[in-house]
Regions:
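Conserved SAM-binding strand-loop segment of SAM-dependent methyltransferases
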Residues: 2-8
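A conserved structural/catalytic subdomain of Rossmann-like adenosyl-cofactor enzymes
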Residues: 11-167
Length: 167
């Protein structure tokens, strides 16, 4: 792996250590861009996807990233990447840190998004966890309703679709 803590807009796509003159052939990434950045953070997504030839990407992004200021970024992204799923996350997922509704966008990298491609829109606002914002609590995340199983179900939905699952 090549795990780096860098400014992703300034990242040149090279290995961060070892053979630093060679391109790192990433085939997967997870990104949580700053939502206040250009295009509601989608400028980071566009750059990261543009550095890959193939693979998959998961983006944790605010709900407004699908429209408005991000529209031109999204058009460019979909010219060479397919949106597989848009997953609505719980509104309190960043409780105590941020109060923004977030989604996870899952992309297949290197394949143009065709107009007839079916995107999976998944409402995961009830993930089974209860969150608290108590500062001194040892556990601010309580599994109240099969949370681990629910997260596995989301993975299976994205990978296989509802037709292959017993839901």
């Amino acid at each position: 792996s090549n795990i780096l803590n860098e400014d992703s807009l300034g990242y040149n796509g090279k290995y961060g250590f070892g053979e630093t003159d060679k391109d790192f052939p990433a085939d997967a990434f997870i990104l949580n861009p700053p939502y206040s950045a250009e295009g509601n953070g989608m400028v980071f997504v566009e750059k990261a996807l543009g550095m890959m030839n193939k693979g998959y990407a998961a983006i944790i992004i605010q709900n407004s990233a699908g429209s408005g200021k991000a529209k031109s970024n999204n058009i460019e992204i979909l010219k060479s990447n397919t949106l597989i799923a848009s997953i609505k996350m719980p509104s309190d997922i960043f409780i105590g840190k941020a109060g923004v509704q977030t989604y996870i966008y899952v992309f297949k990298v290197g394949e143009k998004h065709e107009n007839d491609h079916v995107v999976k829109f998944i409402d995961f606002s009830n993930d089974g966890y209860k969150r608290t914002s108590r500062k001194k609590s040892k556990n601010n995340l309580i599994d109240e309703n099969r949370a681990k199983e629910r997260y596995q179900e989301i993975i299976d939905l994205v990978k296989f679709g509802a037709g292959k699952l017993n839901i």
